Amino acid sequence: MNVPGDLRYTKDHEWVKLLADGATALVGITDFAQSELGDIVFVELKPEGTVLGEQEIFGTVEAVKTVADLFAPVAGTILELNGVLDAAETVNQDPYGEGWMVKMKVADPSSLDALMDAAAYTEMIGG
């Protein structure tokens, strides 16, 4: 299972990557999540400008087997949606790269410290 060391993780299998500006982050679902969901056929995200609290639902992922909610790993505002996700299978193919979901302005960048690092997430998923 692919668990990049430069990301932070949630118990709900979202990842977050703080970008170089220190205030903006990319958010997506983990490789573990996409493999458990199976073939992803549709991604629905809240619109740009939506203000989210930590753990607030920011969208859903529809797979052949199920529909799953997406939870914001940190509080912030959605700045951009990943237009590539019109081809939802991108999430299965590249969950940490082209398959990111939203770009957020993070309300408090230090809140990422409360999320799991790669080692803790790997342990949680039994890796």
Swiss-Prot record:
The UniProt record lists the keyword Ribonucleoprotein: no
Domain Lipoyl-binding: 24-105
Listed PANTHER family: GLYCINE CLEAVAGE SYSTEM H PROTEIN (PTHR11715), GLYCINE CLEAVAGE SYSTEM H PROTEIN-RELATED (PTHR11715:SF3)
Name of this protein: Glycine cleavage system H protein
Sites bearing N6-lipoyllysine, chain numbering: 65
Biological classification of the source: Bacteria, Pseudomonadati, Chlorobiota, Chlorobiia, Chlorobiales
GO BP annotation list: glycine decarboxylation via glycine cleavage system
Quaternary structure and interacting proteins, as annotated: The glycine cleavage system is composed of four proteins: P, T, L and H.
Textual note on the cofactor: Binds 1 lipoyl cofactor covalently.
NCBIfam families: gcvH, PRK01202.1
A Pfam family recorded for this sequence: GCV_H
Superkingdom per UniProt: Bacteria
Membership in a protein family: Belongs to the GcvH family.
InterPro entries from the UniProt entry: 2-oxoA_DH_lipoyl-BS, Biotin_lipoyl, GCV_H, GCV_H/Fam206, GCV_H_sub, Single_hybrid_motif
One GO term describing the cellular component: glycine cleavage complex
Function: The glycine cleavage system catalyzes the degradation of glycine. The H protein shuttles the methylamine group of glycine from the P protein to the T protein.
Cited SUPFAM superfamilies: Single hybrid motif (SSF51230)
Requisite cofactors: (R)-lipoate
PROSITE patterns registered for this protein in UniProt: BIOTINYL_LIPOYL, LIPOYL
Keywords: Lipoyl
